[in-house]
């Protein structure tokens, strides 16, 4: 029965290809669409942690992830004058333990897409209308084409257009945690060699790292602010806000910002959580950041995507395609795991971005040890069902 169930998956990030993989493996017929012209290269580094590591191994992609993992050998905290405060080895600096690995977002998506090479995927495509009834979901695409599907799974990120089309505003909350994050690539003008530098002061954080591409460096900014942008998606407003927020910050900040116009991969967003009582409505389900973003600072969004994809597809298999039963179980099984990770996301948002008088070697070490312990707990705070 399952092979005749046609499922549209919206979004080629991490959650979309992951759920498509498990749907195909469990006998369904998924198809993917993505509004971008191609898979976005590079991007921020993501962690494969805890139970998600087990899922990656089950998918047969863990060794590929290890082969393409980041290779930061040293992390170094500096003050606004450039003095070294604290130094840690790469894995400890990234809060990774045992067989956990870090990989660039673009590299992970590339691995996932190769794992589902036989699944139809259409780029430069998006949905402008969704209508559902007892028997199917009718989808209208931006090019005017109309298609019917048995189910739709939306994995189109924290600013999910699907969520806005299907769910009313009182069915979800975007919780602003009071901070912003930005990242972009610039030339490796400091000559960093598999190293990350981190400068934290006055509720602001600037990072600079260089890994496998010796001529390039990834700059990162995080900062607290009560200011609300008029248009969170306006890149010029974002860049102006970033400049204004880090004026006279010190260290290499101005040199980094001066090189920002050279970058072609500028990213900026508010540190936000998505809260929903139910991630499903009728024949439509949300997954990944579209459903339960825990906050970019938590580093757990990738793991929620892996676990959510496995459970959603697995419950559909277990229910032999009975989406009502499967969606109910998806919500029941995943909610405690999501809540634990979102609580951790709030804690990280509050514990990072310290005041001037709080930044020290002792504080940095104590915070790292606490984060390591908490990550290990929340990353493994679910017992995965067996569907095969």
Swiss-Prot record:
General function of this protein: An FAD-requiring monooxygenase active on tetracycline antibiotic and some of its derivatives, which leads to their inactivation. Expression in E.coli confers high resistance to tetracycline and oxytetracycline, does not confer resistance to minocycline or tigecycline. Degrades tetracycline and oxytetracycline; the reaction requires NADPH. Degrades and confers resistance to chlortetracycline.
Provide the protein name. Flavin-dependent monooxygenase
Q: What is its EC number?
A: 1.14.13.-
Give me the residues that bind FAD, please.
Answer: 12-15, 34-36, 44-47, 105, 267, 289, 296-302
Q: Which NCBIfam families does the annotation name?
A: tet_destruct
Signal peptide positions are none
Its needed co-factors are: FAD
Return the cofactor note field: Binds 1 FAD per subunit; it is seen bound in two conformations.
Q: Could you provide one GO biological process annotation from this protein's UniProt record?
A: response to antibiotic
What InterPro entries does UniProt report for this protein, alphabetically? FAD-bd (IPR002938), FAD/NAD-bd_sf (IPR036188), FAD_aromatic-hydroxylase (IPR051704)
Give the UniProt keywords, A-Z: Antibiotic resistance, FAD, Flavoprotein, NADP, Nucleotide-binding, Oxidoreductase
Q: What else is known?
A: Isolated from a grassland soil sample.
- What family is reported? Belongs to the aromatic-ring hydroxylase family.
Read off the lineage from the record: Bacteria, environmental samples
Q: What is known of its domains?
A: Consists of an N-terminal FAD-binding domain with a Rossman fold, a substrate-binding domain and a C-terminal helix that bridges the 2 domains close to the antibiotic-binding site. This last helix is flexible, is not found in TetX of Bacteroides species, and may contribute to their different substrate specificities. Binds chlortetracycline in a different orientation (180 degrees rotated on its long axis) compared to tetracycline substrate binding to TetX; binding of chlortetracycline alters conformation FAD and the last helix.
Q: Which EC class does it fall in?
A: oxidoreductase
Free-text activity regulation comment from the record: Inhibited by anhydrotetracycline.
Q: Which Pfam families match?
A: FAD_binding_3 (PF01494)
One annotated GO molecular function: oxidoreductase activity
Species whose genome carries this gene: Unknown prokaryotic organism
Catalytic activity line of the entry: a tetracycline + NADPH + O2 + H(+) = a (1S,10aS)-3-(CONH2)-1-(Me2N)-3,3a,4,6-(HO)4-2,5-dioxo-1H,10aH,11H,11aH-cyclopenta[b]anthracene + CO + NADP(+) + H2O; 7-chlorotetracycline + NADPH + O2 + H(+) = (1S,10S,10aS)-3-(CONH2)-9-Cl-1-(Me2N)-3,3a,4,10-(HO)4-10-Me-2,5-dioxo-1H,10aH,11H,11aH-cyclopenta[b]anthracen-6-olate + CO + NADP(+) + H2O
